[in-house]
Amino acid sequence: QINIIDAEAVAEYVKDNGIDLVYSVGSDLAMPTVAKVSEKLGLPHFVSYDTALTCNLKHKMRVALGNDFKGNVPFKVIEKLEDAEDFECYPAMMKPVDSQGQRGVHKVESFEEIKENFEKSMLYSKSGKIILESYLEGQEISVNTYVKNGKVIFALVSDRVSFKEFPGGIIKKHLLPTQFSKNVVEKVKDLVQRVLQKLEIKDGPAYF
């Protein structure tokens, strides 16, 4: 058994077994390891280690997009409760910066609700950091996309249905085809293209 976030152990296993390609199809958590090992051993890979890490850490992705990026939202990274006292962009989503599967995610309407849920979110943050993101009202969607030479060549937009009884937007199902108009879908594809360019993802699959 090898821990998938232990890049050194994975690299040794790859070398010892003459493996030609390292990839993960089921875990976001493994993608920085995939990129780091592939770079170290000169194996084929879609994105750099820096890009994989940025995509894996919510605060790094927000920073990489930049405050002037059309489609980004107001956000703040906090490590202690006092850091959130001047946050004003409510309602907001409170998330551990480095968790997956909606663990530790809560919608908050005030600083009082941040206090109520702070420790619950922090339980799932390995780095001890939480991000507050201004909440966007509306129908949720997902996008499965593939990019080649910096251009999106495939993008499938689906409607996302979340469990109402759980916090954090845990996905219940995806619906196809999307209910949105062709015009809206084209705007979504444009946003996806711009995000991929900002994150320097030039080849391979991506999911939003």
Task: Report the location of each language-model feature.
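Conserved N-proximal alpha/beta basic substrate-recognition cap immediately N-terminal to
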Residues: I2-F75, E79
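Glycine-rich phosphate-binding loop signature in dinucleotide/nucleotide-binding domains
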Residues: Y13-I19, F87-E88, Y124-K126
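A short acidic, glycine-rich active-site loop
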Residues: S48-T51, L176-K182
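Glycine-rich phosphate-binding loop of ATP-grasp-fold ATP-dependent ligases
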Residues: F75, P91-K120, I130, E140-N144, ...
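Acidic/histidine-enriched active-site and ligand-binding environments that engage anionic O-linkages
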Residues: D86-M94, F154
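Phosphate-binding core of ATP-grasp and ATP-grasp-like enzymes
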Residues: S121-S127, L136-T178, E186-F208
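Short pocket-lining segment of the protein kinase catalytic domain that shapes the ATP-binding cleft
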Residues: E133
